[in-house]
Amino acid sequence: MDHEPGKPWFHGSPVELRSLHAGSKITQNRALARAFSHKPTFVTVSHAGEIRHNGTEQGHLYLIAEDVQAGDVTPHPRTTMAPGEEWLTTRELRVEHLWVTVPVPVPKKQLRENELALLAGQLDSL
């Protein structure tokens, strides 16, 4: 469950930021960070890597603007993502705003109501 040294790190948020505090979620998967920028309550990633979510807010995609060392991140202890996809920061990190993200109402990317109910039921059984 290692991260890839030298590969960029990203953070998605509906809020404008200058830095992240310790405990913030980051990922090396830019598309996943973009999905999180829309403040979804559910995110799924298929085995083929297709990301679907129910987020509807305009958001912001950020690049972590400094080197991230092994001690700067720890695997998210309660993630539902594949190992290595979602990390928590252990210290404050500067970010660079890349762009504003707008949720695209593409049926293929949005989770349907029956899919959301199924996911909610799976979480309740954990």
Q: How would you describe each model-predicted region?
A:
Residues 1-8, 13-24, 28-126:
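Conserved NAD+-utilizing ADP-ribose enzyme module
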